[in-house]
Amino acid sequence: QRRTSDGPTTFASLDAQELPVVREYSAGGLIFDDQNRVAIIARHSRSGHLEWCLPKGHIEKGETPQQTAVREVHEETGILGEVIDSIATIDYWFTGTTQRVHKLVHHYALRQTGGELTVEGDPDHEAEDAIWVRFDDLDDVLSYPNERKIAWLYARKKNRQANE
């Protein structure tokens, strides 16, 4: 005889395709100082690992992606900046315990206009540390392949502009 479960169905037991979809929009990017270094942050991933990444965060109501990039860079690194270029948008999916998330992250190049490197101003306390990294060393330091690609795309864009 076949046994059936009398308990409620939990989201964990559902196929991921059946989970509700949530869309998230974020912005951030590469913030450069006058020595061509980029400020990056360390934060804990969903699995608890410390990972080095670009500063970024959710777009708030009434904000443009550029305004979000400036705000998030300042909150997570202490560095004030201005957007100088658009780089690319990362589009990806991930599955949580109760939903599938479709996330778009807009990345910009920013130039430092002030501030000091610190994580003390991060209202969400997500950033554990912040450091300056030479732009050419980002590929060795950034944890996420998509963010390494952002740096590569910006380097390629700058090289093209220099050769025009």
Mark where each language-model region is.
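Acidic, metal-coordinating catalytic segment for phosphate/diphosphate chemistry
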Residues: Q1-G28
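Short connector loops at helix/strand junctions that flank enzyme active sites
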Residues: E24, L54, D85, H102-V105
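Conserved beta-strand and immediately adjacent loop positions that scaffold enzyme active sites
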Residues: G28, R37, D129
